[in-house]
Amino acid sequence: MLGICRGRRKFLAASLTVLFVPAVTWIYLFAGSFEDGKPVSLSPLESQPHSPRYTASSQRDRESLEVRMREVEEENRVLRKQLSLAQGRSPSHHRGNHSKTYSMEEGTGDSESLRAGIVAGNSSECGQQPAVEKCETIHVAIVCAGYNASRDVVTLVKSVLFHRRNPLHFHLIADAIAKQILATLFQTWMVPAVRIDFYDADELKSEVSWIPNKHYSGIYGLMKLVLTKTLPSNLERVIVLDTDITFATDIAELWAVFHKFKGQQVLGLVENQSDWYLGNLWKNHRPWPALGRGYNTGVILLLLDKLRKMKWEQMWRLTAERELMSMLSTSLADQDIFNAVIKQNPFLVYQLPCFWNVQLSDHTRSEQCYRDVSDLKVIHWNSPKKLRVKNKHVEFFRNLYLTFLEYDGNLLRRELFGCPSEADVNSENLQKQLSEPDEDDLCYEFRRERFTVHRTHLYFLHYEYEPASDNTDVTLVAQLSMDRLQMLEAICKHWEDPISLALYLSDAEAQQFLRYAQGSEVLMSRHNVGYHIVYKEGQFYPVNLLRNVAMKHISTPYMFLSDIDFLPMYGLYEYLRKSVTQLDLANTKKALIIPAFETLRYRLSFPKSKAELLSMLDMGTLFTFRYHVWTKGHAPTNFAKWRTATTPYRVEWEADFEPYVVVRKDCPEYDRRFVGFGWNKVAHIMELDAQEYEFTVLPNAYMIHMPHAPSFDITKFRSNKQYRICLKTLKEEFQQDMSRHYGFAALKYLTAENNS
């Protein structure tokens, strides 16, 4: 308290200094500008010697006065700058925007409270406390449905997390798709002092499905009406946000506005910044009833406890039923109904200053809300055109949005010091696991990677696929980084059926991928490709984690474990479905091997049959995969036998065997200790053998590896001795773990390794 008083005394002293110095200066200059009781101009143009009274001495005096005046003005400018900084650091700054008034934006009865806020913010009374306590939890509700909205929510949440200083509790009204995506995202994001609760949007459909709605948000655009019924009964207040919102300030400032509600005010809203509700946008335009310009519901402050007491549910239903008799449907979803209720009950609304919802719609007048960047609090992209909307300041707004769109979300994992938080079991387990490896161990970074939790965004693009009813469907599974993006279109042309891909990208690269995909006719025509973004963290490429993510999120009973550099033969999908049935994969432990070949040519006339492939093999256009570098990796496939085989044949496991296989979706995961280059597939095939999988080579299947520049990890493997030493150490530890897990039968792997 004493510190606050001292701060205010400094603030008052600085204010008096700024006022006092100019006053004394101008008195001094004014007195000095008289000679013999007559005024003398200080203007350089008027001070030319045109009178006998003019002397060299008086000219020097005037020049010195002008120099002194400029010095005083510069001192005054510096003092003003210091004063503005002091205002920015003062506690009153965090109570809301009390220092600015916009009479045209304030609602009835609001100007008094705003003026009171200004007085309170600038008074020297030391007993006043901040409107939002340091560790007070701020509650935010968001309606989210579908794949695209899930991406938008991430950008919104980033902007909120970037500025926040308080614990947050997000209440997400989500459909099954959004829940799966966002639950995984927040679970792997592990942001401290953030709690997430989900509410099933599909269960709420019956509450609003009777309302015809023409808005592009569909039925989900009406669900804000039922928040009083949906959210916990003990929740008193909540900030409700659209998914197309971007914050440019601490959300606690908006939360503090709740303390300014008076009487029966239960809704905090910003006036609509277009002429939509005035009905003059085009001829015969007939909007829903609204108070003046109406209000925009992209940002809402809801006093839930009072709304429940007022029987809000009954209030909005009766209003909607009455208006629908003449309007037939809503045009702006819940916003039309909120405005119709407010038209009948204007006392319900507290009008927020318009900078809390700067609307960038097609007919907006939002530029009247702000004079400079510091006025902006919340930006609302409430046009179907989103970033393509026309606005004279749209470039600035777009850059602000892109800042959060591409911002590294891992940097938002910072702790809120001084605020107690609930114990997070996952976080505690992670810290325990990370503390186990010895930091002095030369392979510490390798061991640490095994426990690193990577932020994961499932189904980054729209996904839609219904598996075949005969239970023979196969999904191609692969992983990639940004430098292999060019392979996607080629793979999609060769494999027209379901694909599950894990992409290892930064936040900025994820947006580059999105733009690339949206600009590709081939990729946009496919809805059966699941793109799962695993965000970058650490120095190694987590190849086996990526494979596990892609494997885990398939909707078919079988999967083809491939790599992004391989193109499968045309028609492989149908051939695999037949083979799955013929070899009874559903009831047996089999791994079907797809023989792998490679070409050194970037432009290849892809063989359309086995006969064509054999011809190219004989001519030296194709080779068996890694025949000159790592023969042992695919030698057990027995390519000599494959050339003449017409029926599937069984092969035995051998050391360093790493074929590409088709297996059931319940097969073991890849071992996460192997990152970067080396032993990642070998270890998996070894475990399949330990679990008594039978390896069967398909006689009429093949895949071809396309050439590319060496990866960063293989370069490190070849050039870094310590990298190779650590890989060998991890390999030995894996073999020991196999022996402990599978017993005597696993000893053959140690023997085979010693003999190889």
UniProtKB/Swiss-Prot annotation:
Cofactor(s) listed in the protein's UniProt record: Mn(2+)
Cytoplasmic compartment segments: 1-10
Pathway(s) of this molecule: Protein modification; protein glycosylation
Any GO molecular function: hexosyltransferase activity
Chain residue ranges for the region called Xylosyltransferase activity: 138-413
Pfam family, one: Glyco_transf_49
Positions bearing carbohydrate: 97, 122, 148, 272
Glucuronyltransferase activity: annotated segments: 414-756
Subcellular location: Golgi apparatus membrane
Keyword match Translocase: no
Any GO BP annotation: skeletal muscle tissue regeneration
UniProt membrane topology term: Single-pass type II membrane protein
InterPro entries tied to this protein: Glyco_trans_8, Nucleotide-diphossugar_trans, Xyl/GlcA_transferase
Positions of Mn(2+) 2 binding: 563, 565
Alphabetical UniProt keywords: Coiled coil, Glycoprotein, Glycosyltransferase, Golgi apparatus, Manganese, Membrane, Metal-binding, Multifunctional enzyme, Signal-anchor, Transferase, Transmembrane, Transmembrane helix
Transmembrane segments: 11-31
Keyword Transmembrane helix: yes
Domain of life the protein comes from: Eukaryota
Residue stretches in coiled coil: 55-90
Region listing for Disordered, in residue ranges: 42-63, 81-109
GO cellular component terms attached to this protein's record: Golgi apparatus; Golgi membrane
Biased composition annotated in UniProt, kind: Polar residues: 44-58
Enzymatic reactions: 3-O-[beta-D-GlcA-(1->3)-beta-D-Xyl-(1->4)-Rib-ol-P-Rib-ol-P-3-beta-D-GalNAc-(1->3)-beta-D-GlcNAc-(1->4)-(O-6-P-alpha-D-Man)]-Thr-[protein] + UDP-alpha-D-xylose = 3-O-[alpha-D-Xyl-(1->3)-beta-D-GlcA-(1->4)-beta-D-Xyl-(1->4)-Rib-ol-P-Rib-ol-P-3-beta-D-GalNAc-(1->3)-beta-D-GlcNAc-(1->4)-(O-6-P-alpha-D-Man)]-Thr-[protein] + UDP + H(+); 3-O-{(1->[3)-alpha-D-Xyl-(1->3)-beta-D-GlcA-(1->](n)-4)-beta-D-Xyl-(1->4)-Rib-ol-P-Rib-ol-P-3-beta-D-GalNAc-(1->3)-beta-D-GlcNAc-(1->4)-O-6-P-alpha-D-Man}-L-Thr-[protein] + UDP-alpha-D-glucuronate = 3-O-{beta-D-GlcA-(1->[3)-alpha-D-Xyl-(1->3)-beta-D-GlcA-(1->](n)-4)-beta-D-Xyl-(1->4)-Rib-ol-P-Rib-ol-P-3-beta-D-GalNAc-(1->3)-beta-D-GlcNAc-(1->4)-O-6-P-alpha-D-Man}-L-Thr-[protein] + UDP + H(+); 3-O-{beta-D-GlcA-(1->[3)-alpha-D-Xyl-(1->3)-beta-D-GlcA-(1->](n)-4)-beta-D-Xyl-(1->4)-Rib-ol-P-Rib-ol-P-3-beta-D-GalNAc-(1->3)-beta-D-GlcNAc-(1->4)-O-6-P-alpha-D-Man}-L-Thr-[protein] + UDP-alpha-D-xylose = 3-O-{(1->[3)-alpha-D-Xyl-(1->3)-beta-D-GlcA-(1->](n+1)-4)-beta-D-Xyl-(1->4)-Rib-ol-P-Rib-ol-P-3-beta-D-GalNAc-(1->3)-beta-D-GlcNAc-(1->4)-O-6-P-alpha-D-Man}-L-Thr-[protein] + UDP + H(+)
UniProt similarity note: In the C-terminal section; belongs to the glycosyltransferase 49 family. In the N-terminal section; belongs to the glycosyltransferase 8 family.
Protein name: Xylosyl- and glucuronyltransferase LARGE1
Gene, per the UniProt record: LARGE1
